[in-house]
């Protein structure tokens, strides 16, 4: 069995060891705090050391003060948007002559189709009798009056 006096001695020795470890930790943390306080963080652009928020920049994370970080982000956004606008302009204006000639060809094709339709309609009218032509004419007139009314 264990002697109760031995337990007390063991717990006392453990307490003394713990207090010595705590003292060492306090000393090391205070020395690291002193090193941090001696090396004040400053903004990479303007050099200020007091800001409510540190922001990431070209020099790495938390290297810019709040104001410089916002300015830097806005500049990056405008550069990116300008690049995308330039790309859009270039894609639309690749060959303006090609677009004009394409429009002209489409207009000519439309005219040809209209001419073919009118000749086909004339042929149909010739095949229709007098009553059918009158019916088609009445339908066209009723449709035109409903459109323009």
Curated annotation (Swiss-Prot):
Disulfide bonds: none
InterPro entries: Znf_GATA, Znf_NHR/GATA
GO cellular component term of the entry, any: nucleus
Zinc finger (GATA-type): 37-91
Domain of life: Eukaryota
Protein location: Nucleus
Annotated spans, Disordered: 1-41, 76-102
Main localisation: nucleus
GO molecular function, one term: zinc ion binding
Basic and acidic residues bias (residue ranges): 1-10
Coiled coil regions in record: none
Family the UniProt entry places it in: Belongs to the type IV zinc-finger family. Class B subfamily.
PANTHER family named in the record: GATA TRANSCRIPTION FACTOR 15 (PTHR47172:SF1), OS01G0976800 PROTEIN (PTHR47172)
Name this polypeptide is given: GATA transcription factor 15
Lineage: Eukaryota, Viridiplantae, Streptophyta, Embryophyta, Tracheophyta
